[in-house]
């Protein structure tokens, strides 16, 4: 009787790969009034490190501007994780790397953005949850259309 190998999915390490904050118009920007317009961009990526180990990145860039002109701040965070995937079919592994891992990492990135912006003297930025499954499906459709 053959021994069936059990699938393995585990978090090996979570870490901040990159964190930057720019306040180009400080200190004058703190004296200005108005509601900032906040723009958020998110990207994900993964790479194979060695057999069974993958690095996944979630990069969040938040820009706040007054009157759609003067930048209050620009904050970029790359939250990363090393994940172990073994005995998992390639299609399922792609889904884990493109959806499950970013879902695990995003709350850490969101906290890093909020904490950094607050420590810079601005009100906290509360980022809404992201549907990484929808993003993954769009990427799959775009790749299929381009093939």
UniProtKB/Swiss-Prot annotation:
Its main location: cytoplasm. It is found in: Cytoplasm. One of its GO terms (biological process) is protein tetramerization. InterPro entries: SecB, SecB-like_sf. It comes from the Bacteria. Signal peptide: none annotated. One of its GO terms (cellular component) is cytoplasm. Disulfide bonds: none annotated. The keyword tRNA processing does not apply. GO terms for molecular function: unfolded protein binding. Keywords: Chaperone, Cytoplasm, Protein transport, Translocation, Transport. The keyword Transferase does not apply. Belongs to the SecB family. One of the proteins required for the normal export of preproteins out of the cell cytoplasm. It is a molecular chaperone that binds to a subset of precursor proteins, maintaining them in a translocation-competent state. It also specifically binds to its receptor SecA. HAMAP family: SecB. Homotetramer, a dimer of dimers. One homotetramer interacts with 1 SecA dimer. This is Protein-export protein SecB. The lineage of its organism: Bacteria, Pseudomonadati, Pseudomonadota, Betaproteobacteria, Neisseriales. The gene is secB.
């Amino acid at each position: 009787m053959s021994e069936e190998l059990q699938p393995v999915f585990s978090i090996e390490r979570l870490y901040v790969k990159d964190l930057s904050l720019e306040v180009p118009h400080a200190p004058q920007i703190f004296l200005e009034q108005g509601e900032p317009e906040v723009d958020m961009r998110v990207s994900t990526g993964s790479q194979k490190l060695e057999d069974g180990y993958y690095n996944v990145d979630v990069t969040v860039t938040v820009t706040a501007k007054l009157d759609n002109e003067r930048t209050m701040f620009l904050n970029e965070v790359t939250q990363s994780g090393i994940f172990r995937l073994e005995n998992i079919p390639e299609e399922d592994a792609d889904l884990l790397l493109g959806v499950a891992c970013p879902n695990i990492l995003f709350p850490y990135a969101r906290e890093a953005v909020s904490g950094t912006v607050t420590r810079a003297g601005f009100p906290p930025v509360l980022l809404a949850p992201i549907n990484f499954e929808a993003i993954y499906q769009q990427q799959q459709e775009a790749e299929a259309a381009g093939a």
